[in-house]
Amino acid sequence: MIKIIVAGFKGRMGSTATQMVLETADFELVGVYDPHEAQETVSFNDETAIPVFQRLEEVLAVKPDVWIDFTVPEAAYPNTRFALEHGMAPVVGTTGFTEEQINELTNLSREKAIGGLIAPNFAIGAVLMMQFAQKAAQYFPDVEIIELHHDNKLDAPSGTAIKTAEMIQEVRPAKKQGNPQEVESIPGARGADFEGLRIHSVRLPGLVAHQQVQFGSVGEGLTIRHDSYDRRSFMTGVALACRQVVQRTELLYGLEQML
């Protein structure tokens, strides 16, 4: 039985992750963390009351194996660091980490010999989309990314879009696309510039998480797209990560590292 605590349990992703833990036979929800929650316990599905922790140090009393984090960027880094320092393997879906923070956390995990995962996207289909895009970029160097999310998402572009761009750049040299003399009549019209690759962010109500990688070449085009219509699409990856991190001795970045 893997003992799990969930941080950010009241958010969309956090609540879905909490439900997944409760419904999974080999997982045990030993607590939830929210520094702003006044209640001392909370019940899910009218079952046993689960302790709510407002201070990080309080979490240690239930000795979790895994710390699931779907919070906000300014909280996720100290949360993840705390988890690693106290023997908990973090599974983090919060985006917005800097490269320096990821490197620091990776080094700490190696020191402590504790596994962990930070992943921009836990949907298996999204991970495959990124891998397919990386493969296609070897033959189609002209590419743009369009990512679409619900209008409450805080960061843009999405972590998935950034990760996709990074994977593409591993196999494709920096390349400025479009007409060298092009002019934006409205600033930002061509999207964010990632080493010549353009990323476009759409935020609309009714969306969940979607991404399209658009390739173009002489006389042909290739579109690779993934759609998450429900947040449950991410839970297969979260469950997989929870089982994997307790067997590993290093923090990884990207769910593809565990597939």
UniProtKB/Swiss-Prot annotation:
PROSITE patterns: DAPB
Active site residues per record: H149 (proton donor/acceptor), K153 (proton donor)
The keyword NADP is annotated on this UniProt entry: yes
GO biological process, alphabetically ordered: diaminopimelate biosynthetic process; lysine biosynthetic process via diaminopimelate
Residues binding (S)-2,3,4,5-tetrahydrodipicolinate, per UniProt: H150, G159, T160
Signal peptide start-end: none
GO CC, alphabetical: cytosol
EC number: 1.17.1.8
Pfam families: DapB_C (PF05173), DapB_N (PF01113)
Entry's localization field: Cytoplasm
UniProt-annotated binding residues for NAD(+): G8, F9, K10, G11, R12, M13, G93, T94, T95, A119, P120, N121, F122
Disulfide bonds: none
Keywords: Amino-acid biosynthesis, Cytoplasm, Diaminopimelate biosynthesis, Lysine biosynthesis, NAD, NADP, Oxidoreductase
Main location: cytoplasm
Assigned protein family: Belongs to the DapB family.
Protein name: 4-hydroxy-tetrahydrodipicolinate reductase
Species annotation: Enterococcus faecalis (strain ATCC 700802 / V583)
